[in-house]
Amino acid sequence: MLVVIMFFIAFAFCSWLSYSYLRPYISTKELNKSRMFYIT
């Protein structure tokens, strides 16, 4: 039972970490796309 809880916590932590890493990359990508569209 404890192993399942630990696995769930690790999975949630990894998903949160990947989300926090990918969110600024996605936002800057969208920003650059809109900026290029605005320039052209």
From Swiss-Prot:
Main location: virion
Transmembrane segments: 2-22
Keywords of the record: Late protein, Membrane, Transmembrane, Transmembrane helix, Viral envelope protein, Viral penetration into host cytoplasm, Virion, Virus entry into host cell
Subcellular location per the Swiss-Prot or TrEMBL entry: Virion membrane
Entry superkingdom: Viruses
Membrane topology: Single-pass membrane protein
Lineage, opening ranks: Viruses, Varidnaviria, Bamfordvirae, Nucleocytoviricota, Pokkesviricetes
Originating species: Variola virus (isolate Human/India/Ind3/1967) (VARV)
Protein's name according to its UniProt entry: Entry-fusion complex protein OPG076
Record's GO cellular component terms: membrane; viral envelope; virion membrane
Virion surface side of membrane: 23-40
Family in the record: Belongs to the orthopoxvirus OPG076 family.
Entry's Gene Ontology BP terms: symbiont entry into host cell
Assembly notes: Component of the entry fusion complex (EFC) composed of OPG053, OPG076, OPG086, OPG094, OPG095, OPG099, OPG107, OPG143, OPG104, OPG147 and OPG155. Except for OPG095 and OPG053, each of the EFC proteins is required for assembly or stability of the complex.
Post-translational modification summary for this protein: Unglycosylated because produced in viral factories instead of the classic ER -Golgi route.
Function: Component of the entry fusion complex (EFC), which consists of 11 proteins. During cell infection, this complex mediates entry of the virion core into the host cytoplasm by a two-step mechanism consisting of lipid mixing of the viral and cellular membranes and subsequent pore formation.
Triggers of expression: Expressed in the intermediate phase of the viral replicative cycle.
